[in-house]
A protein has these predicted regions:
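Short amphipathic alpha-helices and their capping/turn segments at secondary-structure boundaries
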Residues: 32-34, 38, 70-79
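Short, aliphatic-rich beta-strand segments
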Residues: 45-50
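Periplasmic OmpA-like peptidoglycan-binding domain that tethers envelope proteins to the cell wall
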Residues: 54-68, 72, 80, 90-168
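Short Gly/Ser/Thr- and Asp/Glu-enriched loop/turn motifs at secondary-structure junctions
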Residues: 40-44
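Terminal ABC-like ATPase head and other globular end-domains that cap long coiled-coil arms
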Residues: 75, 83-86
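Extracellular/lumenal/periplasmic "stalk" regions immediately C-terminal to a signal peptide or transmembrane helix
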Residues: 1-39
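Generic structural signal for residues in well-ordered beta-strands
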Residues: 38, 85, 135-137
Protein backbone atom coordinates (compact mmCIF):
# COMPACT_ATOMS: atom_id res chain seq x y z
CA UNK A 1 0.00 0.00 0.00
CA UNK A 2 2.79 2.43 0.93
CA UNK A 3 4.67 1.71 -2.31
CA UNK A 4 1.49 2.24 -4.35
CA UNK A 5 1.04 5.60 -2.57
CA UNK A 6 4.63 6.60 -3.41
CA UNK A 7 4.12 5.65 -7.06
CA UNK A 8 0.88 7.69 -7.19
CA UNK A 9 2.58 10.72 -5.60
CA UNK A 10 5.51 10.50 -8.03
CA UNK A 11 3.16 10.07 -10.99
CA UNK A 12 1.12 13.11 -9.90
CA UNK A 13 4.31 15.14 -9.46
CA UNK A 14 5.61 14.08 -12.90
CA UNK A 15 2.35 15.04 -14.61
CA UNK A 16 2.24 18.42 -12.82
CA UNK A 17 5.82 19.05 -13.92
CA UNK A 18 4.93 18.25 -17.53
CA UNK A 19 1.93 20.61 -17.40
CA UNK A 20 4.10 23.33 -15.86
CA UNK A 21 6.77 22.83 -18.54
CA UNK A 22 4.23 22.80 -21.38
CA UNK A 23 2.50 25.93 -20.07
CA UNK A 24 5.80 27.78 -19.87
CA UNK A 25 7.15 26.71 -23.27
CA UNK A 26 3.83 27.55 -24.94
CA UNK A 27 3.88 31.05 -23.44
CA UNK A 28 7.41 31.82 -24.68
CA UNK A 29 7.97 33.40 -28.09
CA UNK A 30 10.34 31.91 -30.70
CA UNK A 31 12.86 34.63 -29.83
CA UNK A 32 12.64 33.85 -26.12
CA UNK A 33 13.03 30.11 -26.76
CA UNK A 34 16.48 30.81 -28.25
CA UNK A 35 17.64 32.04 -24.83
CA UNK A 36 15.53 29.89 -22.51
CA UNK A 37 15.93 26.14 -22.03
CA UNK A 38 13.32 24.19 -20.06
CA UNK A 39 13.95 20.63 -18.86
CA UNK A 40 12.47 18.20 -16.34
CA UNK A 41 15.01 15.97 -14.61
CA UNK A 42 14.16 13.61 -11.71
CA UNK A 43 10.92 15.41 -10.90
CA UNK A 44 12.49 18.88 -10.92
CA UNK A 45 11.87 21.62 -13.50
CA UNK A 46 14.99 23.50 -14.67
CA UNK A 47 14.57 26.78 -16.55
CA UNK A 48 17.92 27.98 -17.84
CA UNK A 49 18.17 31.62 -18.95
CA UNK A 50 21.06 33.03 -21.00
CA UNK A 51 22.93 35.75 -19.11
CA UNK A 52 23.03 38.14 -22.08
CA UNK A 53 19.22 38.15 -22.13
CA UNK A 54 18.95 38.88 -18.40
CA UNK A 55 21.85 41.21 -17.58
CA UNK A 56 24.16 43.87 -18.91
CA UNK A 57 27.70 42.50 -19.39
CA UNK A 58 29.70 42.24 -16.15
CA UNK A 59 26.67 43.43 -14.19
CA UNK A 60 23.83 42.00 -12.14
CA UNK A 61 21.28 44.62 -13.22
CA UNK A 62 18.28 43.07 -14.98
CA UNK A 63 17.93 44.11 -18.65
CA UNK A 64 14.68 45.67 -19.86
CA UNK A 65 14.27 42.90 -22.43
CA UNK A 66 14.21 40.26 -19.67
CA UNK A 67 11.00 41.66 -18.16
CA UNK A 68 8.57 39.89 -20.49
CA UNK A 69 10.26 36.51 -20.06
CA UNK A 70 10.47 36.90 -16.28
CA UNK A 71 6.78 37.88 -16.17
CA UNK A 72 5.87 34.58 -17.87
CA UNK A 73 8.06 32.63 -15.46
CA UNK A 74 6.55 34.54 -12.50
CA UNK A 75 3.05 33.60 -13.67
CA UNK A 76 4.03 29.91 -13.71
CA UNK A 77 5.59 30.23 -10.24
CA UNK A 78 2.42 31.93 -8.92
CA UNK A 79 0.20 29.23 -10.47
CA UNK A 80 2.14 26.42 -8.76
CA UNK A 81 1.98 27.43 -5.10
CA UNK A 82 3.09 24.01 -3.81
CA UNK A 83 6.51 24.41 -5.40
CA UNK A 84 9.65 26.05 -4.06
CA UNK A 85 11.95 27.98 -6.36
CA UNK A 86 15.75 28.15 -6.29
CA UNK A 87 17.39 30.82 -8.43
CA UNK A 88 20.97 29.80 -9.19
CA UNK A 89 23.57 32.02 -10.87
CA UNK A 90 26.36 30.44 -12.94
CA UNK A 91 29.34 31.91 -14.80
CA UNK A 92 32.08 30.80 -17.16
CA UNK A 93 35.66 30.46 -15.88
CA UNK A 94 36.92 33.83 -17.14
CA UNK A 95 37.96 35.94 -14.14
CA UNK A 96 36.06 39.19 -13.60
CA UNK A 97 37.98 42.29 -14.67
CA UNK A 98 37.59 44.03 -11.32
CA UNK A 99 38.99 47.31 -12.72
CA UNK A 100 36.34 47.44 -15.46
CA UNK A 101 33.50 45.97 -13.40
CA UNK A 102 30.57 48.36 -13.40
CA UNK A 103 29.70 47.35 -9.85
CA UNK A 104 32.61 47.74 -7.43
CA UNK A 105 31.37 45.06 -5.02
CA UNK A 106 32.01 42.26 -7.54
CA UNK A 107 35.30 40.62 -6.54
CA UNK A 108 35.00 37.41 -8.56
CA UNK A 109 32.62 35.01 -10.33
CA UNK A 110 31.19 33.80 -7.00
CA UNK A 111 30.05 37.34 -6.21
CA UNK A 112 28.70 37.92 -9.71
CA UNK A 113 26.72 34.65 -9.76
CA UNK A 114 25.24 35.21 -6.29
CA UNK A 115 24.34 38.85 -7.01
CA UNK A 116 22.70 37.88 -10.31
CA UNK A 117 20.59 35.22 -8.60
CA UNK A 118 19.62 37.71 -5.91
CA UNK A 119 18.65 40.27 -8.57
CA UNK A 120 16.26 37.79 -10.19
CA UNK A 121 14.74 36.90 -6.80
CA UNK A 122 14.18 40.57 -5.95
CA UNK A 123 12.82 41.28 -9.43
CA UNK A 124 10.27 38.45 -9.10
CA UNK A 125 9.21 39.78 -5.69
CA UNK A 126 9.14 43.51 -6.51
CA UNK A 127 7.67 43.39 -10.03
CA UNK A 128 5.40 40.34 -9.92
CA UNK A 129 4.54 39.77 -6.26
CA UNK A 130 6.05 36.30 -5.90
CA UNK A 131 6.09 35.30 -2.21
CA UNK A 132 9.63 35.79 -0.83
CA UNK A 133 9.40 32.69 1.40
CA UNK A 134 9.15 30.49 -1.71
CA UNK A 135 12.38 31.84 -3.24
CA UNK A 136 16.03 31.07 -2.55
CA UNK A 137 19.01 32.71 -4.29
CA UNK A 138 22.39 31.06 -4.70
CA UNK A 139 25.58 31.47 -6.71
CA UNK A 140 27.68 28.64 -8.14
CA UNK A 141 30.36 30.77 -9.82
CA UNK A 142 32.16 28.83 -12.53
CA UNK A 143 31.96 25.54 -10.64
CA UNK A 144 28.82 24.04 -12.19
CA UNK A 145 29.52 24.13 -15.96
CA UNK A 146 27.16 22.51 -18.47
CA UNK A 147 29.70 22.80 -21.31
CA UNK A 148 33.44 23.09 -21.81
CA UNK A 149 34.93 26.50 -21.07
CA UNK A 150 37.50 25.84 -23.82
CA UNK A 151 35.25 27.30 -26.53
CA UNK A 152 33.31 30.56 -26.80
CA UNK A 153 30.07 28.60 -27.34
CA UNK A 154 30.73 26.56 -24.20
CA UNK A 155 31.49 29.66 -22.15
CA UNK A 156 28.28 31.25 -23.39
CA UNK A 157 26.25 28.18 -22.31
CA UNK A 158 27.86 28.29 -18.85
CA UNK A 159 26.90 31.95 -18.33
CA UNK A 160 23.33 31.34 -17.23
CA UNK A 161 20.83 31.71 -14.45
CA UNK A 162 18.77 28.66 -13.59
CA UNK A 163 15.33 28.77 -12.06
CA UNK A 164 14.83 25.41 -10.39
CA UNK A 165 11.24 24.55 -9.43
CA UNK A 166 10.76 21.70 -6.96
CA UNK A 167 7.73 20.25 -5.17
CA UNK A 168 7.71 21.14 -1.44
Amino acid sequence: LYIRHLVEVKSKSDSLNMVLTNNLTRSLSKEEMKEVDVQVLKGVVYISLADNMLYKSGSYEINDRAQETLSKIAKIIMDYKDYDVLIEGNTDNVPINTEAATMKNIRNNWDLSALRASSVVQYLINHFGVEPKRLTAGGRGEFNPVASNDTEVGKQRNRRTQIIITPK
